[in-house]
Amino acid sequence: MDVMRIRGGTPLKGVVKTQGAKNAALPVMASCLLLKGRTLTLENVPDLHDVSTMLDLLACLGVTMERLGNRMTFSVPEEISWEAPEHLVRKMRASSLALGPLLARCGKTVLPLPGGCSIGSRPIDLHLKGLMQMGAKIEIRNGIVYAQADQLRGRRIYLDFPSVGATENLMMAAALAKGETIIENTAREPEIENLASVLRGMGVTVDTEGTGCVRIKGVEEVQGCRERVIPDRIEASTYVLAGVITGGEVTVDDIVPAHMDALLAKLEEAGVRFHVGSSSVTVFPVRRLMPVSIRAMPYPGFPTDLQPQMVATLTLANGVSLVEESVFQARFLYSEELNRMGANITIKGDTAIIQGVERLQGASVRAMDLRAGAALILAALAAEGETRIDEMVHVWRGYEASDKKLKALGADVALEEAEEK
């Protein structure tokens, strides 16, 4: 279904359970490529378009999968393909996560430059630079990466930016590299620790230290293991904000509250009352938010993947809020769609200036990417009248059964197919 219609103005109320994290599931799925004649079992894998794309990619490389609910078991044969199909890689940026494990396992790989959400410039130069430091020979011709390395070797690598994808790719490559690899200025997101846990289960010595440095001692061959995908902190935070923007009372369950500290700190600053349990957060009705200033940055800072949803929520704050984006370029394109709904957002460079308004109005809008779509859903839930959101296919990449979850909270939501042009 490509279109979501929402009739807003109803305070949401109830409990929503959190899915497994998309951004954790994809790298740990890719890590199965390190195996040889063994299996990897993952629990709590979300049912998402991006997960399906990764499954298709792994299948094309020779991996078989058995699924029971949210449990997946990947069986990897002794021999796998080292050439990734272009039509799948172009669909999803996370396809680049096959690069490190394929190169380490097969000694060579051919991988088209990946696709996914169009959010400014998102190159994989840090991935390639790190692999070359480990001994890989890499060429890019006509948008395709050709990589070769008879034996990757452990090195001390400094990332110029704490890229999540580069950290994950280099961690997987280091698992089969000769000697110790030390990666400095790494990403510190919880999803990194989830991958580290999988690699430890495979018999690799991994020390993440929690300080932006990862040490990995490579092994000749990894073993099969079982691991659970962590809860999705971005999905959980989105539903927390759905409660806030509608003036409702929503409990988000099956979470790790510490992973949401940055959001909760800003909500407290904005005047939101909430209760934090051992594995849940409940937000209570607030008449109107106070304005806040936010800078989206790598973890443990405020997550860039939550920036659009927070901007949508702040459109109804009592005053002027400032939101700066420091991770991705051109991540405010959705603001034009929010302004169509009556928001007052001005973009100056990397900062959104949000003048709060009394109310939003339903309109026809377009989800240009995954998190932009989530932001429009939040705005629609609070708006007067009906909102039509087109190109919902982007949202299905990262949110499992969002229409059903919203309906369970009392939202007036309907899905339909887009009209053929």
What do these predicted regions represent?
Residues 1-421:
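Short, structured segments at the rim of ligand-binding sites
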